[in-house]
A protein has these predicted regions:
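Short S/T/G/P-rich N-terminal loop/turn motif that feeds into the first structured element of a domain
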Residues: 1-202, 206-230
């Protein structure tokens, strides 16, 4: 699969309205034509007023066909675009790939009703959303270290991989990895435990040292319609 990875900066205070429009119209229209929602996040700590939505397609041809189909859908250009566009200040997009060890989400995800356990669980979850820039040619070595060492260590402390992407078109030599936590306390406890794990300090860190150029991180929330790892 390939992924259309979109980061939008919204007008201050516009995130709830944008999220509601996505849930009520945009999501349905995209899914109707075959786009798979791989993630929907909004910033809590970091650069504020940002939303990230990630859409999966079988290949580049499928992406072109699906995007042409939903852009031509009357519900898109008559209802969704007029509602969403005035809320958006800037847009950035990348085409990303994902490795075999990353989760793949179904085209349509069940949306829990307000107040249900599933709804409350998603509202409590937090996501450590990390974008790393690497030296040219370094991503394969980093990917191997992540799969063989970092992911098993994080899993040991209840941390789940929500997404792992590397850039194909856009800003190159970048990896975005997204880690799911039950709540803020779990995030703090798990990160402390991972950092203190001897395998992390003795095996993982030496393998990736020297590969990175820059690191950026956000604390993000998801929505009731955003897919999350089991």
């Amino acid at each position: 699969m390939i992924y259309d990875f979109r980061m939008y900066t919204l007008k201050p205070g516009a995130t709830p309205d944008y999220r509601a429009g996505a849930k009520e119209i945009g999501l349905t229209v995209r899914q109707r034509h075959g786009a798979a929602l791989a993630g929907w996040y909004w910033t809590e700590i970091g650069a504020l007023n940002q939303v990230v939505h990630i859409w999966g397609y079988n290949d580049a041809k499928h992406m072109r066909e699906v995007r042409a189909a939903f852009y031509a859908d009357p519900e898109w250009y008559e209802k969704y675009s007029p509602r969403a566009q005035p809320l958006v200040e800037t847009q950035k997009t990348w085409t990303m790939n994902s490795p075999a060890f990353a989760p793949v989400y179904p085209v349509i995800v069940d949306i829990p009703a307000d107040g249900t356990p599933g709804f409350n669980k998603k509202n409590e979850m937090v996501f450590d959303f990390r974008t790393y820039t690497f030296k040219p040619g370094s991503i394969p070595a980093y990917m191997s270290a992540a799969e063989e060492v970092a992911i098993p260590i994080r899993k040991r402390y209840g941390v789940k991989l929500a997404g792992w992407y590397y850039s194909e078109i856009g800003d190159l030599n970048q990896v975005t990895h997204i880690w799911a936590f039950d709540n803020l306390k779990h995030l703090k406890d798990a990160k402390d435990a991972v950092a203190a794990d001897p395998e992390w300090t003795g095996t993982y860190i030496p393998r990736v040292r020297g590969l990175l150029v820059a690191q950026n991180t956000y604390l993000m929330n998801t929505t009731e319609f955003g897919p999350v790892p089991d």
